[in-house]
């Protein structure tokens, strides 16, 4: 059997009242290569995790809704046998509704106590969870109201996640969009739209405790296209023992209450090294979110847009085509290098920062160590009022620096002392 229309099968009604789980799982277990979910009369209702097999494509019509039943406390979709390797899985289309107002995962039930070991049987509040898959594709779908992450992946090689809309009610903390764990390689994550209540994209080589499906390197990842109106954090790279190498983040748009990029360690494995190599940002058009009326997502103006965490080692970091027009008062610098952090080479080019607020806005604040700093075609200015903010505020060490075509207006002159 090569193609199955689930509405033609017994046990699948799509009326929003009857449980469709058994019928949908029977379709997945039938050996069909393509399982089609047309738009039903209401929505598909599931009470247990649907399990896909190697070589399958689950193709839902764009507006076909799959909803998790109240009090199901289960992930919505995964691959078979996380202990073995699955290959060639495609998920396309649909609106995947985690119905979080009527679920409780252990993370929230225990007062956000995540310091327990990872258990594959534990409900983590995730919508789509995949582990040990080669050639995985997830595209053209909406992720709605998870307890925690929209997509969680570990041990994945050759993958694409693209054309994803996040329709989150922001009811819970830790509501990531696309969350990767260790041993994920050769992936493209693109065209993500909508606000989450934590990281839109998390590349966590080490995660710690409850959520740590795997530990290991993350390499060769492209993130291209993130749009948020009032986001939390666009991209996180977390290394606490395992390296992250060769990552490109491009075309990020919007305002963020927390960070644009959160880079480095989080002390989930104390004493282990945090190392990121060859990191490129290209086309970042972001600012601080104005104070929200209802700050469910938190509001932390003291964080820079780009934060290199203390005790983090970055071998090479490039920021190209960065534009920020800021209206929010009392915000942190654009780029912050934390105490004890080291960046071998930091190159920034084609950057424009305009401060419309009355308070200072520094471009770069270094509290760590930068071996080589290069600024090229950078323009920073503060509109009106007294001179305020600095291009480079250096409270650490800069061994070598080179500036070319740097323009400042109504700021202090560039700090050219190492």
Label each PLM-derived region with a short phrase.
Residues 1-418:
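Extracellular/periplasmic carbohydrate-active domains that bind, remodel
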